[in-house]
Curated annotation (Swiss-Prot):
Purpose of the protein: Nucleotide-binding protein.
Molecular function (Gene Ontology), one example: nucleotide binding
UniProt protein name: Nucleotide-binding protein PC1_1036
Origin species: Pectobacterium carotovorum subsp. carotovorum (strain PC1)
Xref: InterPro entries: DUF520 (IPR007551), UPF0234-like_C (IPR035571), UPF0234_N (IPR035570), YajQ-like_sf (IPR036183)
A single cellular component GO annotation: cytosol
Amino acid sequence: MPSFDIVSEIDMQEVRNAVENATRELSTRWDFRNVPASFELNEKSQSIKATSESDFQVQQLIDIMREKLLKRGIEGGALEVPEEFEHSGKTYSVEAKLKQGIETTQAKKIVKLIKDSKLKVQAQIQGEQVRVTGKSRDDLQGVMALIRGGNLGQPFQFTNFRD
């Protein structure tokens, strides 16, 4: 029986490249001239810290980072930015987390979405991924379209397609 896995993974090398590209863009933008603005990638906690003088500039930094991530093939939904910015002294900063892996609550939403679609497939949660099994490839492709179209707030990839 054909099957595939729904996963949410981020290539950290591409994230590193995006951070370097964003830092390079900061040095060429006129609105960030003589402004202590920076990006900092923490691979251990899988987060990106943006720091600048004002909250408006921090928001611009986040927009630049999303643009660079998108150019490197990582969707903007993979970056989870908190509403409140940290303020200490003269600087504002925000630590945006990179979403990787499917949490249990998110996996349950995916399984419920698949079951409510009435497609003849079975979905089961396996750790940080969801395995979908069906009798025909067409049903599995329908599930892929459903997941891509469903606004689930996180980018997903489809791996391990077996016939």
